[in-house]
């Protein structure tokens, strides 16, 4: 096998459709656009979602729910992630330093997921009931 003998598999490379090249081609003259009408004109296509003057689906259906702006600045950290840290005194800045949360996060909640095997002190961080019990079980503490 040489580089000059390599070729794509049969049917792998599809040639582009050449329109307007005579009636014998099957797509000559009107080029597959039919006769007259908006779709046959240059630039003549409706915008996406246009239903011929009927109220479009995205406007017929009601708006639903909302996106909380607090969720943008809120994140959660698991106990197993805290267990991997070397610090014993933990604040939000420690999480940012270890890339557990992004820099725009202002509120963090620790959730009970995984295990914690050493005592840590959490300050200024919200904690779920289960996570608080797990931290206090290994002689750790949580303070607001």
Swiss-Prot record:
InterPro entries: Ribosomal_uL15, Ribosomal_uL15/eL18, Ribosomal_uL15/eL18_sf, Ribosomal_uL15_bac-type. Residues 21-35 have a biased composition (Gly residues). Keywords: Ribonucleoprotein, Ribosomal protein, RNA-binding, rRNA-binding. The keyword Phosphoprotein does not apply. The keyword rRNA-binding applies. One of its GO terms (biological process) is translation. NCBIfam families: rplO_bact (TIGR01071). Belongs to the universal ribosomal protein uL15 family. This is Large ribosomal subunit protein uL15. It comes from Vesicomyosocius okutanii subsp. Calyptogena okutanii (strain HA). The lineage of its organism: Bacteria, Pseudomonadati, Pseudomonadota, Gammaproteobacteria, Candidatus Pseudothioglobaceae.
